């Protein structure tokens, strides 16, 4: 590619930096002048002491069999990839981060090819014109190819949009025409008729500016519009921003039209008898799918016949796993599988998936890709030689599928039929490295399973939809994100705000409809035992109250530190308050500095402790909580260091459990107790030992090969009264219906995590009514967290929150601390700015 070709294809917005950009690009094109960041293509760097598996052909290659070993390709280090990304970003600054990353991945990190791909296939930010057609061969990883009908392709030609802006600052006053055509007419109509909230959707338009525009309406013609904008000191660029918004709305309208067409096609296929599948004969004869599961199977078969990917979003506990197993059995029974299938699951559900497949369909041959690095290396060697053959299903975890460059390469290259993602809400953020890795898996079709498709905001749902149907949404993703990120901010006409939000809701529902199947337990499980949810506001113990109020008083009297200190800003302060609200031993009050000096001396002389400098050891102990100090000393066999039992049992929540647990045990109930914090679970363990209750425990540190044994033991052994679980590790994908009581010791900021946790026992197979206890420390920051969680739960019903998740979390923290510490408005704003700076400039 010549320099002139590059210059010709560059966007107008990048022309001012063309010379430096071409210089940056040239170093990647001409080997003899290449920058040192580019390794010579004649050799492949190897990490000393590590062997490479046989390299597999990339799916971009021209060969027919992507599993055939090919010549070794250039392998770049992470640093080299970062440098190439920076070079591409510098050359193409007007393209989205994800678009640049995807283009580099598609072109094997060739910067010149990546830049060409961007300019031919992707829209720069704010660009609305047509794009040149790409000459690159598409990859068969689900991003292009047979995941839906060609009639559904989201080409830019579908929405005719003008490349010319409606306002040009070089136009003279005499050139202002009263005659309007095309885009000007649409912008003029919008500026005359848009509501306050609609005007606020235009870039740079605040509520104050939008009100000023409404005050000078109506506009008689184009020149009147421009003159009145000038009279209220608003730039004509505002008209271009309005044009940009209208074009985005047109793009989304085109997508909605396509979605409606897809719904019509699906309905026609169903009415013509597509689907109508009964329980596959390959399923175990003694097991029977529920009626709604048969419907789910038929939905999957219709989607398969229409070559459409989908999201099975049944509420937690409705047996999504079983429906997928039945679908895979249907494919095998009818000879429809074109290759092996991949199922990607959280570590905690790996063994459960294997057990359920064996139980429901023993005919499906399962290969579990798991184990040590050496074991996986040997398996990769076999896959490199034979491909994914000899089995129907390859089962692995989210962690392992992207664990090493070799594994990412393997799943990008080897062909798969279906890839199924369990707990797919893990893909809700399209900016993460995990999302970028998983979207390159080379599968013909995709199915996502999630019981909570909506958690924080609409954009998370859009991330899932873009993952499941990438080509359908890819070229419009920035427009979709922009529109769904808008939120009605007016404090005025609430009917107007509600109408704006209702429009967003209806858009989201129409986009979702072809791709998502969601049923609720209350609608399909008529015989499921009832669930009673109780919020128990528990008073703190007397000493706990003293500690909590001391902390609040300290920060209330040092508001400057709260609002400005980067080290002890918002979240850290809130966490200290949460710790004391849960248990005093999560902070340090019992062990004095003098105690720590003595402990430091003993540890320095201990053969099992590596450090010998007493001062360093003291400083390390000084930042620990009482319980951490106790654990440290016991770890190194100083068993004389103890915390009295009365202090371990001294928290408001434990005092409540002193009444609740004996009553539950006497009545024959069994309990799941969840906490977000493993340190809190450590203290609960000590409490249960003191109270002589039998228990077992599962958290993120529990070995994967042990987890299923723990679940089996609890379900089969009535003597185990309490199962301790961390909310994240133990709250997804496991069946614990032997319990009928769930205690949420400390609630999560994200209430959907708690809902997942409680559904471990309230699900298919439960025979008894279920009771959920949420413990909230009275008059503490936990009451504010509960209110924030209840607001988020409205998403599931209304789909109304359209803010970015990170910003929403930050505002929650600011609001909670403002209330807890009595900050005034200026201090609240200062804290908000401090958190903004902290997020923008994280510590290195």
From Swiss-Prot:
Catalysed reactions listed for this entry: ATP + H2O = ADP + phosphate + H(+)
Segments forming domain Helicase ATP-binding: 301-471
Position of sequence motif DEGH box: 422-425
Biological processes annotated in GO: defense response to Gram-negative bacterium; DNA double-strand break processing; positive regulation of innate immune response; positive regulation of transcription by RNA polymerase II
Low complexity: bias regions: 1-23
Modified residues (Phosphoserine): 834, 838, 841
Biased composition (Polar residues): 30-42
Cited Pfam families: Helicase_C, SNF2-rel_dom
Residues at which ATP binds: 314-321
SMART domains: DEXDc (SM00487), HELICc (SM00490)
GO molecular function, one term: chromatin binding
Family matches, as InterPro entries: Helicase_ATP-bd, Helicase_C-like, P-loop_NTPase, SNF2-like_sf, SNF2/RAD54-like_C, SNF2_N
Family under the similarity heading: Belongs to the SNF2/RAD54 helicase family.
Protein's UniProt name: SWI/SNF-related matrix-associated actin-dependent regulator of chromatin subfamily A containing DEAD/H box 1 homolog
